Swiss-Prot record:
Gene designation: Epp
Organism: Drosophila melanogaster
pH curve summary: Active at pH 4 and 7.4 with ecdysone 22-phosphate (E22P), 3-epi-ecdysone 22-phosphate (E22P) or 3-epi-ecdysone 2-phosphate (E2P) as substrate.
Domain of life: Eukaryota
Compositional bias of kind Basic and acidic residues: 466-479
Alphabetic keyword roster: Cytoplasm, Hydrolase, Nucleus, Protein phosphatase, SH3 domain
Name under which the protein is recorded: Ecdysteroid-phosphate phosphatase
Active-site residues (renumbered): R498, H499 (tele-phosphohistidine intermediate), H681
Matching CDD domains: HP_PGM_like (cd07067), SH3_UBASH3 (cd11791), UBA_UBS3B (cd14301)
Catalytic activity, reaction form: ecdysone 22-phosphate + H2O = ecdysone + phosphate; 20-hydroxyecdysone 22-phosphate + H2O = 20-hydroxyecdysone + phosphate; 2-deoxyecdysone 22-phosphate + H2O = 2-deoxyecdysone + phosphate
Enzyme Commission code(s) on record: 3.1.3.-
Residues covered by the SH3 domain: 271-336
Keyword Coiled coil: no
Length: 751
């Protein structure tokens, strides 16, 4: 038998083995990506592998800065974990809710060890390695809580690190700067001019075994080691000092025993921007608009957000790098650090309660922790984020992310009606017959497999039914005047209601399709009104004075019925002159069975912000036109602010808008007694109640944020208790429903 001759050429096995040892950068280069793009992608994704980097490059295909030489900015934090972090997160949430946004909310709780510095993209891997090496070289880990000393002044609140512990952290910072200076500057001395520009603090510390060029010796090396502190609040109004001080005093720093070092980086464009989180998706209608996706972040100029009169601003997408205009109220402000990339986490404590449990729990793009609930964090050590790994578990990470996202939906309360036997023989008239039990510990799998007849239903403790308890099929809703609490019956109330669903927001551009050349209205959908009243300026007049959809009319009627069941008494009715508001008010009064008993008083001063109407006051229907259309308006009512006054307010500021609505509500209260129903716009719920309850006018951005949380037919109740007005829970439940897009019948025959 012939001897098998050896092969001189490289075999497939050797080729396969060699490819397995390629670095992510080499793989990206083999895929055809230019070096500078590949390095930028790896740095932007924290060196988490080829798949994530290539996805980033594809997402940024329309990023105009993709080929720019713009080094990322890096920073090193010492971050608390465990019980102390939970305290701080609760403080962050409460301080923001009670006192509004301040500078501390822009970042995760931290102690800054090395301030922002710039580094070229090819150095990101070395920066990450250096952090681990520094801790390994130091050796000693914290075995007790850091000593933190509270400090409070009129413009700053926080904890300062005691000298002994501060020295330990300073040594880490100094050693890191030294390590980076040696490894990066010396190893890339031929590119020193570029490095010097990126590292303005490097050069003072050098190694005797390395050759650092003379031109670098004048560079100052200064890590952030002066007065190490953890900021709790700053840049806050002095009026909030006492409230913040009370919150700070509840913090217990004695449990600050778990800490970790984190290396973050950010897009250099982020340095002067405000970060907004997308909360509602948006598909562009114009070429200059930016697509909004849930999970994306938008970089905006603070000045543009505050000065925009139409609610639109130009922003940059964190996800794609694209620039375009977007509706600001589809986003909400969030911490700037949410849009940073996390490169490395290294433990500083012997007892570990990490906030980042494992590589799988990190967002696969920027490294933020997916789980933000304190109970979801495991008190176990997480492995280091390995630079240059292939990150083959990305699919599992996505699956885990989806499980985390869907968890609230999968753990909805289990609702079960008692069986007919129980309804017939065991029903207690004072006990609601639906039991809602929340099983937060069970998984979606176990819930889906559990037979319905095996759900244990335990009757709740007997209690009088609430008048608005619509979940209870046997609640007593008979109208007994004596059933209301006597003290609450005497208190004066204002019911402020937003109009229902409107045609223009539901169908978009509708006028050209619903009116013929003679101006005759033609219904195009069952959710559109059958007819429209006559108006002198038709159809143009409907452009800024949209009618309700039929769903909107029904929404308003439901609210009226619920108020009737709750035995709400209405003594006066005021309404914005917008047709959609008049329709809403009429339908609500029908539900309240007050048609013909309460006339609608039209008050132009209740109209929404005039900055949204630069072309002037809308051409509303006249009182005669409304009367002809069978609307029961008060023809004799003289408004507090006539429509002519609005013409002079076309450029009113947000504060002036609040003052206008507040002035109207004060005068209405002075002129009347009893309860008042106000039907107007989304803004009205806030502008007519905020100052009345002791608040101050919101900024433009804050107003946009709050109105997006006020859906159609929302109802706010303000009650006067001992001479003080305050927001209270409405007597009726809200109305909630899903979107129902248009059905195209021929879609069934499409091939």
């Amino acid at each position: 038998m012939a001897t098998l001759p050896p092969r001189k050429s490289q075999t497939p096995t050797r080729i396969c083995i060699s490819k397995q040892h390629l670095t992510p950068l080499q793989t990206l280069l083999q895929m055809g990506f230019p070096r500078h793009r590949a390095e930028k992608a790896l740095a932007s994704t924290g060196n988490r592998g080829v798949q994530i980097a290539s996805d980033w490059l594809l997402a940024h295909v329309n990023d105009g800065t993709l080929d720019e030489c713009a080094p990322r900015e890096y920073i090193i934090y010492a971050c608390p974990t465990g019980p102390f972090l939970q305290q701080l997160e609760e403080f962050w949430a409460k301080s923001r809710q009670m006192c509004g946004w301040n500078g501390a909310h822009n970042y995760v709780p931290h102690i800054t060890l090395v301030s922002f510095f710039k580094a070229p993209d090819e150095c990101s891997l070395q920066l990450s390695k250096a952090l681990k090496q520094v801790v390994d070289m130091t050796g000693a880990l914290l075995d007790r809580p850091l000593k933190l000393e509270p400090y409070m002044s009129q413009n700053f609140m926080g904890f300062f690190v005691a000298e002994e512990d501060a020295n330990y952290l300073k040594r880490l910072a100094l050693q890191y700067v030294k390590e980076v200076s040696n490894s990066i500057i010396s190893d890339t001395y031929e590119q020193l001019d570029a490095i010097v520009a990126c590292f303005p603090w490097c050069g003072a510390v050098s190694s005797g075994t390395r050759c650092i060029p003379r031109s670098s010796r004048s560079i100052s090396l200064e890590p952030h080691v002066k007065s190490l502190h953890l900021t709790l609040a700053y840049q806050f109004p002095q009026a909030q000092f006492n409230a913040l001080k009370a919150l700070v005093e509840t913090l217990d720093a004695s449990c600050a025993s778990n800490w970790e070092l984190r290396l973050y980086s950010r897009d250099p464009r982020l340095a002067t921007k405000q970060v907004q989180k997308v909360v509602y998706p948006h598909n562009p209608h114009e070429t200059d608009e930016l697509e909004l996706r849930i999970g994306d972040y938008i970089y905006l100029n603070t000045e543009v957000v505050d000065s925009s009169s139409d609610g639109w601003a130009e922003g940059i997408s964190w996800l794609t790098g694209s620039t375009g205009h977007l509706p600001v109220n589809y986003t909400e402000r969030t911490a700037e650090s949410d849009a940073w990339t996390l490169h490395r986490v290294v433990q500083l404590s012997k007892s570990v309660a990490s906030s980042l449990t494992s590589a799988e729990d990190l967002d696969i793009v920027d490294g933020r922790s997916i789980s933000t609930e304190p109970d979801d964090r495991q008190n176990t050590a997480h492995p280091d984020i390995i630079e240059g790994s292939s990150f083959e578990e990305s699919e599992q990470s996505v699956e885990k992310y989806l499980r985390q996202t869907l968890k609230p939906c999968l753990e909805l309360p289990s609702v079960q009606l008692l069986n007919s036997h129980n309804l017939t023989h065991q029903h207690n008239p004072n006990t609601p017959t639906i039991e809602i039990t929340t099983n937060m510990s069970s998984s979606s799998t176990s819930m889906s497999k559990q037979p319905v007849d095996e759900i244990l239903v335990e009757p709740p403790a007997a209690q009088p039914p609430r008048p608005d308890d619509t979940l209870s099929v046997h609640s007593d809703h008979s109208l007994h005047p004596g059933s209301l609490d006597a003290s609450h019956a005497k208190n004066r109330k204002i019911y402020i209601m937003r109009h229902g669903e409107r045609v223009d927001f539901t169908f978009g551009t509708w006028i050209p399709y619903c009116f013929d050349e003679f101006g005759n209205y033609m219904r195009k959908d069952l959710n559109m009104p059958k007819t429209l009243p006559r108006r002198k300026n038709s159809p143009e007049g409907w452009q800024n004075d949209s009618p309700l959809t039929n769903v909107g009319v029904y929404q308003a009627n439901l609210i009226g019925q619920a108020l009737l069941e709750a035995q709400v008494q209405i003594d006066h009715v005021y309404c914005s002159p917008s047709y959609r508001c008049i329709q809403t008010c009429t339908s609500a009064l029908e539900g309240l069975k007050l048609t013909g008993k309460q006339k609608i008083k039209l008050e132009p001063g209740l109209f929404e912000w005039m900055a949204w109407y630069p072309s002037g006051v809308p051409d509303w229907l006249t009182k005669n036109e409304l009367t002809e259309a069978k609307f029961d308006v008060d023809l004799d009512y003289e408004p507090v602010q006539p429509a002519s006054e609005l013409t002079a307010r076309l450029k009113e500021s947000t504060e002036q808008f609040y003052e206008r609505n507040h002035d109207v509500i004060l005068q209405l209260l002075e002129q009347t007694t009893g309860n008042i129903l106000v039907v107007a716009h989304a803004t009205t719920l806030d502008t007519c109640s905020r100052q009345l309850t002791g608040g101050v006018p919101r900024s433009t951005n804050e107003l946009r944020q709050v109105i997006h949380k006020i859906p159609y037919c929302s109802l706010a109740t303000v009650e006067q208790v001992d001479g003080v007005w305050k927001l209270v829970e409405p007597e009726c439940l809200p109305v909630t429903h899903s979107k129902n897009p248009r059905f195209e019948w021929n879609a069934l025959s499409a091939t």
